C-alpha cells in the first residue's frame, strides 16, 4: 500500500517536470528554474511523501487494532466495547492484550459485577485496599466501573512484574495470592504454584 502511494507521488512529480520541459521547448523566452525553486519543489514533494507514509502507518495500526478486537471478541464471545476496553487499557498499562483477556476471563468470567468470597471486585477482582494504593479516594462502587477496574488491575500486575524481576509466573501468583505470601513461600524454599499462573498462561511450571 505504501509503495503504491509513493509511486503515485513520484508519477505526479515526473508529470510536473515533463510539463515544465514542454513549456521550455515551446518558448525561447523560458528561463530555467533556479536551484532554489527546484529545491523547494523537491522538499515539497518529499513532505508529501512523508505525509502519505504517516497516514498509511496510522491506517495500518487502526486496521490491526480493529482486526485484533474482532478476533478477541469472537474468541471470548464478549461485546466489542468490552473487548476494545480490555485491549486498549492493557496496552496503555504495558500488559500484552492476550494476557489481559486471559486474566479477566479467569478472574471474573468477564462479569463487571463479580464479587469474590474475600471481597475482590469487578473484572480484574481487585480488593479495595489494593486499588486505594493507587487512588486513595476510591470507593467500593468505583471498582465496578469498567475503565477504573481494568486500568488498576493491569497496573497492579505490571507493578508485580517489576517486583518479581519480570518473572511473569511469580507475578501472576502474587496477583492471586498476594506478593507477601509468595515471597514468604519462596524464602522458605517452597513453591508458591497453585495452578493460577498455569490457568492464565496455559502451561504448568
Range-by-range predicted roles:
Residues 1-77, 205:
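N-terminal secretory targeting signals
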Residues 48-205:
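Catalytic glycan-binding domains that act on GlcNAc-containing polysaccharides
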Amino acid at each position: 500500500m505504501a509503495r503504491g502511494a509513493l509511486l503515485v507521488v513520484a508519477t505526479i512529480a515526473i508529470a510536473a517536470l515533463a510539463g515544465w520541459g514542454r513549456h521550455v521547448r515551446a518558448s525561447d523566452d523560458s528561463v530555467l528554474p533556479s536551484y532554489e525553486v527546484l529545491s523547494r519543489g523537491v522538499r515539497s514533494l518529499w513532505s508529501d511523501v512523508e505525509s502519505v507514509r504517516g497516514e498509511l502507518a496510522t491506517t495500518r495500526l487502526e486496521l490491526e487494532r480493529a482486526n485484533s478486537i474482532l478476533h478477541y471478541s469472537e474468541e471470548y464471545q464478549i461485546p466489542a466495547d468490552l473487548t476494545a476496553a480490555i485491549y486498549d487499557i492493557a496496552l496503555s498499562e504495558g500488559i500484552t492484550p492476550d494476557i489481559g483477556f486471559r486474566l479477566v476471563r479467569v478472574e471474573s468470567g468477564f462479569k463487571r459485577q463479580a464479587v469474590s468470597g474475600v471481597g475482590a471486585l469487578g473484572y480484574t477482582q481487585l480488593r479495595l485496599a489494593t486499588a486505594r494504593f493507587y487512588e486513595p479516594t476510591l470507593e467500593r462502587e468505583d471498582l465496578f466501573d469498567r475503565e477504573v477496574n481494568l486500568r488498576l488491575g493491569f497496573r497492579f500486575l505490571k507493578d508485580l512484574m517489576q517486583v518479581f524481576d519480570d518473572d511473569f509466573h511469580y507475578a501472576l501468583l502474587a496477583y492471586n495470592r498476594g506478593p507477601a505470601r509468595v515471597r514468604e513461600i519462596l524464602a522458605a524454599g517452597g513453591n508458591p504454584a497453585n495452578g493460577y499462573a498455569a490457568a492464565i498462561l496455559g502451561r504448568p511450571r
